[in-house]
């Protein structure tokens, strides 16, 4: 529906992603994508539309975090935190290479000014941590197996980051395989 309506310039945050994001990227709907990994399904080749956008330098801004850090960022968003201190990316290229420069970030109000900031650990003198920004989500889209007409949802299987983004977002769009009664879902 997003593709059909022609809406563009979305800022997308996602943990491990797949075909859903690949379609949006391929249709030019995503302005900036903050992610850790995107593949066609499971752990296969990188999504082809995403790969094309990156290799041919289409207008996709990309910021890369490690999988554990992006998942923690989404959880921190559900807790209402402004930033998250981590040690997980220390010494890696993810700490030193920014996909979206500070100059470009300042032109996009929905993006934080920096990818990260090395700050002193307030609990251990002489030690630093990496502070990463926590996203402020406008809308989350989650897929569930069952939902009631009142919005109660049931996820059967892995939840991944769906619960965190549903709590964090101002609005939630739920895609349900089946609409059931309140009695059945409770």
Question: Residue spans of the language-model regions?
Answer:
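Conserved alpha/beta enzyme-core scaffold
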Residues: 1-186
């Amino acid at each position: 529906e997003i593709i059909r309506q022609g809406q563009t310039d979305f800022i997308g945050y996602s943990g491990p992603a797949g075909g859903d994001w690949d379609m949006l990227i391929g249709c030019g709907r995503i302005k900036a994508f903050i992610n850790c990994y995107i593949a066609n399904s499971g752990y296969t080749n990188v999504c082809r539309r995403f790969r094309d956008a990156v290799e041919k330098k289409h207008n996709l801004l990309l910021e890369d975090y490690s999988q554990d850090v992006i998942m923690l960022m989404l959880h921190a968003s559900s807790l209402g935190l402004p930033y998250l201190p981590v040690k997980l990316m220390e010494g890696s290229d993810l700490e030193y290479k920014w996909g979206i420069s500070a100059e470009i970030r300042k032109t996009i109000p929905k993006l934080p000014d920096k990818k990260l900031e090395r700050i002193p650990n307030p609990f251990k003198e002489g030690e630093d941590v990496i502070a990463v920004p926590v996203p402020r989500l406008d809308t989350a889209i989650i897929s569930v197996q069952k939902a009631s007409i009142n919005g109660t949802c049931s996820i059967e299987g892995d939840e991944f980051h769906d619960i965190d983004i549903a709590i964090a977002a101002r609005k939630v769009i739920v895609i349900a395989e089946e609409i059931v009664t309140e009695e059945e879902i409770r």
